[in-house]
Amino acid sequence: MDWKTVQGRSKHEGISFLTITLPDFGKDFERSLDLGQVDRSLFTGFQWKGGLPRFLGGFLDLVFDRASGRLLNKPNVDAVLAIRQLTLMFGKISLPCSDARERKAMLDFIKCEQDVRQSDSERSPIDFEAFCRMSDLLFARMFSRVDREIYYGDIRGKHGPGSTADRLLGNQKYDQQVWTRRLENVFPFGDHIFPSHSYYDLYESVDILEPGMEIPVKVISVPKTLKTPRIIAIEPTAMQFAQQGILRAMLDSLRKDDILPGLIGFDDQEPNQLLARVGSLDGSLATLDLSEASDRVSNQLVRAMLRNHPHLHEAVDAVRSRKAEVRGHGVIRLAKYASMGSALTFPFEAMVFLTLVLMGIERELNQPLCRKDVKHLIGQVRIYGDDIIVPVDTVRSVVGMLEHFGARVNTRKSFWTGRFRESCGKEYFMGEDVSIVRFRKEFPARRKDATQVISLVAFRNQMYYAGYWATCKWLDEELRRILKHYPVVAPSSRVLGRHSFLGYETHKMHATLHSPLVKGYVISARSPQNPLDGPGALLKFFLTKASLNGSSQKMSHLREPDDENHLRRSGRPHAVDIKLRMASPF
């Protein structure tokens, strides 16, 4: 019956049944786990039988009582996992949204800006003072170290591989000729872009933009779900370069702190995931998720955090783009610090949220916190971007504080009542891992659909490790129709193939190395031609091939280039292909 429902509604409603309707069912199921019962306001669009939806009724009966809708005393964890896997699997498939949903996302971006301005105008002096006191308690030492590095000129920028608002790609970024007056006051072009002082005669060719003439960030959408796209902002090359330098200094300084590494993370999600499991096991910890998290962090809050650190304050302001070009709305001035796209968005949003979380805990305890008190909260409080862990007995005060300062808590993805918890891509119920495997790309029709083939092979192998072996058997049959050679390989092999607990295949031995070889398809992705010479090439060598010595970031030794063609080709590949090769199975 369930299979017929999926088949019939998919035929009638199209792919949106799999990508929107079923995921909504899954989210309502998670909400029911948190509430401890099934509410009649949930599961809209599905027929009911008794106190539960008829769809997936066999699984639901193992979790909830059908007569009352209440959670069973001993709910079946396998049934919880099955329902989540079946309903949420296609929720984040990478497909373009409709034009109407794209326009709505851009309009929401504009409305979010208005909300930030409104929140700024309503913030009282008492709020501001409390925020500054907590921020100083947490970050003053860290900021002082970075402030000192900026004063002594120890910051070194870095170019990333992504797109930029001024459309410079790959090696072109090392020949940039545009800077801003605000950057020039903190990070002089000659000191940071010219490889040595002997090139200072080229200064006259540099275009130093005054504040009113700066290039705005370009706001674009990228696939997230079929329901709504993700909104990001593409930064100008100059801003992106300087942001990376400050980011590196901030992360180095944070790691040296005696408290902060235990409360906030930037490159390791596992601590959040482990705490989420604890919360699902004993109910002591809540997991919170924020909507439009980075877009709701006010620039005024960031300025307040840095007010006692003048050099860092000026630098962070200098690398912030003040305007954004929004499709359909023109160029607007930004009230937020920055959207996703700036290298500093992630750390500053996390630091602002940590400050607000501890302010909420302080209010709940009705006493001011000191650093010793904060240290005792390690293992109970953890921030990773907009994924937040807090003690359950402080959650309402924390939520109130976050929303008072302009954040928006996503109640559909925040959990603290029952025994379901979610953080940083892991989900737990009663201490058991009920995380799912997601289908990311459309099904490939032929071998030349390389991106989809690669994604499907990865999906198959994830399903294998999750124990869905019957599904893997069906997927293997489908993949063999697309890939003539589809061997069993180790996870470390670059060959597209099946993973197995039973080892790997060997088709022949290497003639000279006498090591195993297997015939299969490997990923082929070449960076576009992008030749670089002259001072730009020398700058790239100094910036990317220098081993940095601690927080001072001075060169300790120089290494040979990792890619001998890096001065001829650079940037992200325009296309990805798969080619048949003899390669190592491990």
What residue spans do the PLM features occupy?
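C-terminal, non-catalytic extensions of nucleic-acid polymerases
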Residues: M1-P229, Q462-F586
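A conserved non-catalytic segment of reverse transcriptases
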Residues: T417-Y464
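Short helix/loop capping segments that flank catalytic or ligand/cofactor-binding pockets
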Residues: I220, R230-I232, A242-Q243, D295-S298, ...
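Conserved polymerase palm-domain catalytic core
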Residues: S280-Y384, I389-F405, R412-E427, A445-K448, ...
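Conserved PLP-enzyme active-site core in the AAT-like
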Residues: G265-N272, V398, F405, F429
